[in-house]
From Swiss-Prot:
SUPFAM superfamilies: S15/NS1 RNA-binding domain
Organism encoding this protein: Ligilactobacillus salivarius (strain UCC118)
UniProt entry tagged with the keyword RNA-binding: yes
Quaternary structure and interacting proteins, as annotated: Part of the 30S ribosomal subunit. Forms a bridge to the 50S subunit in the 70S ribosome, contacting the 23S rRNA.
Entry's family note: Belongs to the universal ribosomal protein uS15 family.
GO cellular component: cytosolic small ribosomal subunit
Protein's name according to its UniProt entry: Small ribosomal subunit protein uS15
One Pfam family per UniProt: Ribosomal_S15
Taxonomic lineage of the native organism: Bacteria, Bacillati, Bacillota, Bacilli, Lactobacillales
An example Gene Ontology molecular-function term: structural constituent of ribosome
Alphabetized UniProt keyword annotations: Ribonucleoprotein, Ribosomal protein, RNA-binding, rRNA-binding
Length: 89
């Protein structure tokens, strides 16, 4: 269900602000988005997997908080990230 380490590393390279950046808001949001998409596919196939559904809701809430933080601190970076990830905002 969780994304592979290779895929996570690719995402980190793409959205990193500098070399070795693994914790910036952009990287965290991008990794969470990939996780959310994977979990969403799993939930569609396994509708009664309520534990995974709860994990999905927690990840969505965490991403929402990070997006709000990024929007409040740097609107331009927020808009670029939302556009590149294809989030509806």
């Amino acid at each position: 269900m969780a994304i592979s380490q290779e895929k996570k590393n690719e995402i980190m390279k793409k959205y990193a602000r500098h070399e070795g950046d693994t914790g910036s808001a952009e990287v965290q949001i991008a990794v969470l988005t990939a996780d959310i998409n994977e979990l969403n596919d799993h939930i569609k196939a396994h509708k009664k997997d309520y534990a995974s559904y709860r994990g999905l809701m927690k990840k969505i809430g965490h991403r929402r908080n990070l997006l709000a933080y990024l929007r409040n601190t740097d609107v331009q970076r927020y808009r670029e990230l939302v556009k590149s990830l294809g989030l509806r905002r």
